[in-house]
Amino acid sequence: MAQLSLQHIQKIYDNQVHVVKDFNLEIADKEFIVFVGPSGCGKSTTLRMIAGLEEISGGDLLIDGKRMNDVPAKARNIAMVFQNYALYPHMTVYDNMAFGLKMQKIAKEVIDERVNWAAQILGLREYLKRKPGALSGGQRQRVALGRAIVREAGVFLMDEPLSNLDAKLRVQMRAEISKLHQKLNTTMIYVTHDQTEAMTMATRIVIMKDGIVQQVGAPKTVYNQPANMFVSGFIGSPAMNFIRGTIDGDKFVTETLKLTIPEEKLAVLKTQESLHKPIVMGIRPEDIHPDAQEENNISAKISVAELTGAEFMLYTTVGGHELVVRAGALNDYHAGENITIHFDMTKCHFFDAETEIAIR
């Protein structure tokens, strides 16, 4: 079990490329933290600095109150699972899981107990005598997890462990890792570029862009209260719709749209002095409905109708704006069809057009 404190962490390479900038985060014992962001945002580099595989250029890393910047990786009581399984092909599952413990010269009885315990948790008991070549991708990833589990480390680090698996197996392994966290009751830090993994697994999500933390919060918080346009566009699939416009009285207006703003949201805009400058309205696909209400109804033309099974994703053109609408599958929708859509303005978000920061 472990608490981590990352204080003003920096990573600058010799060519002066600033990969991680002033990273600050407090991680409580037993949390499941997910670092998420696009490729090159610094999430894996941050994880590797925690592991001791990358030198920290500035700031302090504390684990249980002890400064770890200069402590070698092997002495940090950390276990790590990588994107590639890195299993020894000539060894059995048992020997792969036991290898690290043998190198530490741990007693054979203890090794046997730990390996069998981990195999039981991961559903690998019947595969212990097999070699990796006889296993599926998901089973190999479980062996890699098992190799980390048997170390009984204070912190588990996972660097995109599911990205080599197919879509169905990723969903299955997502659930297995979440169950594993509950069983082990330990601190886990997980890196992914997949916002769905972040939303479904994390206690808290750390969203990064260009080496800078954009927002830290529970999945529900970052989804419903995004700090800026990047977060609101990155978290959620399909992404949030954005429309640039201005405020005129109690209306959000563009050249072709006029939508009534609820009093509560209008009061915030007035407080933040956003009435006379360009702003961006954001609204999620599920908050635009293909049925008319008393107000805030707009005519839209469907350009693409994607049926995903339980629902449609409607890609529409609305007054020159491209908007995605999430609709139930009870009705049929077709490309080229004209429909009336309703904006639920109680669910909309407003952002400063210049800074892209949420107006609250």
From Swiss-Prot:
GO terms for molecular function: ABC-type transporter activity; ATP binding; ATP hydrolysis activity. It comes from the Bacteria. CDD domains: ABC_MalK_N. Gene3D superfamilies: 2.40.50.100, Nucleic acid-binding proteins, P-loop containing nucleotide triphosphate hydrolases. ATP binds at residues 37-44. Residues 4-235 form the ABC transporter domain. SUPFAM superfamilies: MOP-like, P-loop containing nucleoside triphosphate hydrolases. GO terms for biological process: carbohydrate transport; transmembrane transport. NCBIfam families: PRK11650.1. PANTHER family: MALTODEXTRIN IMPORT ATP-BINDING PROTEIN MSMX, OSMOPROTECTIVE COMPOUNDS UPTAKE ATP-BINDING PROTEIN GGTA. Belongs to the ABC transporter superfamily. This is Putative uncharacterized ABC transporter ATP-binding protein YcjV. It comes from Escherichia coli (strain K12). The gene is ycjV.
